[in-house]
Amino acid sequence: MDNPERQLQQRELSDVLQGALLELNNEQREVVIMKEYEGLKFREIAEVLNISENTVKSRMYYGLDGLRKILERKKITKETIGYGF
């Protein structure tokens, strides 16, 4: 069971990530959410969105790169949140 401090840390991280996701363009955000939060495979995402698997991979790459840059801009790192992600 998580202690209250860990629960607060997880909520804060969730809030930060949700805010960062909103800064991505819709296409990148959609793919990142489907892959990372819903656990779909690239092939499944491609079928759902009716796009090629390579397009899904490209959007995922640029989406994750965008998230990294957004978090860096906000000075949020693995060390500042106490996790490895």
Label each PLM-derived region with a short phrase.
Residues 59-64:
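Residues within the DNA-recognition helix of helix-turn-helix
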Residues 16, 47-50, 65-85:
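C-terminal edge and immediately downstream basic/flexible tail or linker adjoining helix-turn-helix-like DNA-binding
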Residues 26, 36-37:
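Short, conserved catalytic or interaction motifs in soluble domains
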Residues 11, 21-28:
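Short helix-coil-helix linker/hinge
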Residues 1-19:
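Acidic, proline/glycine-rich intrinsically disordered inter-domain spacer in sigma factors
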Residues 25, 41, 50-55:
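Helix-turn-helix DNA-binding motif, specifically the short coil turn and the N-cap/start of the second
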Residues 31-35:
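A short pre-motif secondary-structure segment
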